Amino acid sequence: MNAGPTDEELLAAYAAGDARAFGELYERHERPVFRYFLRQGAAAALAEDLLQETWMAVIRNAERFEPRAKFTTWLYTVARSKMIDHWRGKDDAVSLDDAANDPDEAPLEVVGSEADRPDVRAVSRAQARAFVEAVEALPAAQREAFLLQAEGGLSLEEIAVVTQAGHETVKSRLRYAMTKLRSAMEDWE
């Protein structure tokens, strides 16, 4: 079974002039990067702006990408830089409530006939809101590491590159984040 071209192959094809390759890359990563911005505290409109700035940087720098690291590591490094550039000097943080109330962005999805029951849907929405609030309550460094792993699918090593933190530091941040999230969600088990 052929899984198709890798992200790195698609970026190389785009750099060589294949616009369809960029379209496929964008399609693969647009939603996870958008959710990363939302979960980091950006309102939907700001997340969209940051997403576009991130992809513009990918377009401008596609020819310079050297596949020593995975494309996703590079992409989330660019995304993180765009977010930091935006928030630098700002005191106003935005709530993640927009993401919690948007059914397309809910972190949990219930599928099946039981999901059609209003009481089950209400519990599912409440549980999703509780989870988003628990993620939002994490210290920034722990939240970022968790989101890069959960939303971006990055490995410990890749998160260390993106956040410019040591491997053991990233491991600790993820461990503390998971402990806090498990504790916050105990009532939902």
Residue ranges, per PLM feature:
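N-terminal module of bacterial RNA polymerase sigma factors
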Residues: 1-32, 112, 116, 126, ...
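Helix-turn-helix DNA-binding module
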Residues: 5, 132-169
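Arg/Lys-rich amphipathic alpha helix in sigma70-family domain 2
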Residues: 60-67, 77-98, 124
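Acidic, proline/glycine-rich intrinsically disordered inter-domain spacer in sigma factors
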Residues: 103-133
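Short, charged helix-capping/linker segments at alpha-helix termini
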Residues: 15-24, 34-53, 167, 188-189
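Conserved RNAP core-binding helix
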Residues: 10, 26-30, 34, 44-61, ...
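Sigma70-family region 2
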Residues: 15-16, 39-44, 53-70, 89-91
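Structural recognition of an alpha-helix C-terminal capping motif at a helix-to-coil junction
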Residues: 49-56, 69-81
